[in-house]
Amino acid sequence: MKMSNKKRNADKKPLMYIVQPDYAETTRSSMQEIVIKRKADKPAPPKAEEKPAYHEKQQEEAVAQDVLQEDQKPAAEPVSQQTQEAREPENIKSQEEQKAEPQAVEETVEHEPPKAEKKEEPALEARKPEKEPEAVHSADKAEEKAPPARKVKKPMSKMTIHEKIDFLTKLPHNMPRALCLIEANGRTYRGVIVGRRNDSVLLRTTGNGAPTELAIDDITSLHPLGF
């Protein structure tokens, strides 16, 4: 019976198939119960634990950059030292030039004043003669512009003998001569003063004779009549 069943099954199988072993039907008695206890899944680690790894990477990168910078610094320092050494003589020269400039200026200032004084002296001497004529002209102009002093008219009674003689001798010709009473050398004269000659007065008396000459210093009193 078993052989016939196998042949039948072989006849029914397709050309392409997966060979499977023949096995007997299992009964419950032949089965074993196997209990498998699954372990509880551990909770995922918090993200905070992952951060240290990230930070560690950053720190490693920063350390690597610092190392590179330190390696580059020694190469750059000689260059900077060379530039500083090259600049030091230039700075020293510039400082020396700056110090020399004020000294030169001070020397020029110290030497210049005597020249200026020497130049000013002839200039003043040349100007002096120019100013003197100007002063003369200004004085002349002032005299021309100055108004003539007004003569104060005195009454005849307050005039001196000299003032009376000047007044009577300078009267206009169209005015009549005043008759005067003159005392000189102890004598009294009555007449008209015609003129003046040096320090003497020409007096014409009432007579028709020549005028009498009297010294002004000898006249003790002079009284014009009619004033």
Curated annotation (Swiss-Prot):
Subcellular location as annotated: Spore coat
Residue ranges of the region described as Disordered: 1-157
Biological process per Gene Ontology, one example term: sporulation resulting in formation of a cellular spore
Major localization listed first in the record, in broad terms: other
Basic residues bias locations: 1-10
Composition skew (Basic and acidic residues), residue ranges: 35-60, 85-100, 108-147
Nucleus keyword on record: no
Additional remark text: Largely but not entirely controlled by CotE.
Described function: Has an important morphogenetic role. Involved in the assembly of at least five coat proteins, including CotB, CotG, CotS, CotSA and CotW. Required for appearance of a morphologically normal outer coat. To a large degree, CotO and CotH act at a late stage of coat assembly from within the outer coat to direct maturation of this structure.
Keyword Hydrolase on entry: no
UniProt-recorded name of the protein: Spore coat protein O
Keyword annotations of the record: Sporulation
